[in-house]
């Protein structure tokens, strides 16, 4: 309260409102109708909307598939690997190791094909709307590893480390309908929410936002769809 009465406030913009949620009344107000940038308080809106729509048991998923045929006698996959990104901000090198291990454990030592990243989970926007151009923010790809946009390169290296030889190339391509699921890596919405809210991590918040947009299996989902969910929620609750 002493700081709020400070002469400094005569020359800066400050707006404060403290609300008692139990009694549903304001406890303190200071220039409460002054328009201010909401900044990271909007993460609360995204968190509430996502929990309402997807539930507290929702998982962020990254799926690895294969196509073609595995020759058991030579341990050769005559086909391709596809990794379908689900915009899991917690996907890490350890997940790639387990994915490569799953390939090896399927009895594959050589891949006569390619490794593809399926990025159709979200639109092509690579920066969040309103982000400053000079901020150190990560690329908004649905398939980041340790926050970096280098999945196919790093996964091919992990395959090599596991003794799996890739004789093809790497690239981007959407999953074909005849692909077979090989393994899935997941992180819970609770894990993502913890860092998103405690550290105010923009990547985690954008990832949460796009889970709303892609709800129901929509491909190339855009931010506009997620905003519609948020608008509908707050219209409902007033």
Language-model segment annotations:
Residues 22-23, 34-37, 70-71, 87-91, ...:
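Solvent-exposed loop/turn segments at secondary-structure junctions
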Residues 59-124, 131-138, 144-146:
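Active-site-adjacent, His/Asp/Glu-enriched structural segments that form or flank metal-binding
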Residues 52-67, 163-171:
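Short, well-structured active-site flanking segments
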